[in-house]
Structures are given as structure tokens and as C-alpha cells.
Amino acid sequence: MSLDFTAIATQFVAHYYSTFDSDRKNLAGLYRDNSMLTFEGAQSLGAQGITEKLTSLPFQKVKHEYGPPDAQPTATGGIIILVTGQLIVDDEQRPLGYSQAFQLSQDASGQWFVFNDIFKLVLL
């Protein structure tokens, strides 16, 4: 069975940002206890810690705009994904550039989850 990593990455990214933009606390199910987030240099570990970090971000509204993700399979059967785009927070007129990398893994039941997540604003 071959892994259609590009399709999985595209579906994952659409789901992730749709959920993030509508209600960040609902992202908790995409992480596990051994997941790690690095957000602008600050690390959070585990689904609870990551959800706390994401829901504590200092904005009310956010909209992510991004191009097609780049994806590759990993040696361990996972998928690494790179996303670049812009986000608009609250009612700001100027979007902020960002880059985000995900490493997806599968749990024992075969469900995909975010093992690693790195987010960085791209300020020029």
C-alpha cells in the first residue's frame, strides 16, 4: 500500500487551519502527550500544553492564507509538511508572513496526529 502523502498533507493543512481560525481549542485532538510545539522559540509539550499555548495567543480573530503545502514521507512512515503563508489577526490591515512545519505520525489505531509543530513569523 503506497502512502499518498501529498493528499494527506493537503487535507491535514486545510483541516488544521480551518479549525485554528474558527476555534483553537478544538486542535487538541490533533496532538498527543508526546507531541511538541515550538512557537516563536517557545516550546510546549503534550496536547494539553500545546492547547494552552495556542488558546493563550493574544488575538481574538485570525485568518490563515497559504499556498499548497510541500510534503515528504519520513523514514518512519510519517509525513513532514512545510506551509508558508500570511495571517491576518483581529482587524489588522497588514498581513504577517509565517512559516510552519509539521511532522505527522500515526498512532496505534492508524490515526494521523501532529508529532512536531514549528511555527515562525517571517518578518522582513
Swiss-Prot record:
Entry-linked CDD domains: NTF2
InterPro entries: NTF2 (IPR045875), NTF2-like_dom_sf (IPR032710), NTF2_dom (IPR002075), Nuclear_transport_factor_2_euk (IPR018222)
Domain NTF2 residues, every copy: 8-121
Entries under PROSITE patterns matching the protein: NTF2_DOMAIN (PS50177)
Any single Gene Ontology cellular-component annotation: nuclear pore central transport channel
Subcellular location: Cytoplasm
Alphabetic keyword roster: Cytoplasm, Protein transport, Transport
GO terms for biological process, alphabetical: protein import into nucleus
Source domain of life: Eukaryota
An MF annotation (GO) of this entry: nuclear import signal receptor activity
Listed PANTHER family: NUCLEAR TRANSPORT FACTOR 2 (PTHR12612)
Protein name: Nuclear transport factor 2
